[in-house]
C-alpha cells in the first residue's frame, strides 16, 4: 500500500468514526485527571466559563449551519429543482465549507480544555484538530467523487474552516431553527454530560473527596435523562 493510499484509507476511516471521537477524548481526559497532581489542575469559575463559552460558540456555528441545511432539505423535498447547486453554497456555507466540523471542534474543545491538565490540554487539542482535519479531508474526497468539478470549483473559492469575511457571501434563503435544535440535541446533551462528569472528577482530585456537592449530582442526573430522551427522540436523517 502506498502512502497516498494509506492516507486516503485513514482519512475515510476517521470520517466514518467522527461521532465516536469525542467519547475517546473525554475518556482520555478522565484518565489524565485521575493521574494528575491536584495543585497542577487549572480550576475556577472564570476558567470554567471560558471553556463553556468555547463550546457555546461551537454550537452557535453548528446551529446556523443545521438551520440552513434543514430548510434546504425541506424545500428540495417539495421541489427538487428549488436550488441550482446540488450542495449548500448559501448563508454560512458561502463563507466556510465545513461549518459543522468547525463548530464541532469548538464544542468538544471546551471539555478538553476543562480538564485543566496542562499537558493533556495541549496534546489533546492538537490531536483532536488533526482528527477533525482528517474527517474534513475524508468528507471532501467523498463529495468530490459525488459532485465532481462543480464541487472542486467551490472548494477553490471558499475557505475550509476559517471564514473569509472579505468575500461577499450569499444570503441564506431560509432557516428552520427548531429543526436544527432537534438535530443537535444529542450533541448538546453529550457535551453537557462531559462537562458535568469532568467537573465531578475535578472536584474529586482538587478537594480529595468523593463527597460531591448535591448540585453536581442533580445536574448529572438531569443531563443523563435529557441525553437519553434526545437519543430516543432523535429525528431520522
Regions found by a protein language model. Give the residues of each.
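Membrane-anchoring alpha-helices and their flanking helix-loop junctions
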Residues: 1-93, 105-237
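Histidine-centered phosphotransfer motif of kinases
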Residues: 96-99
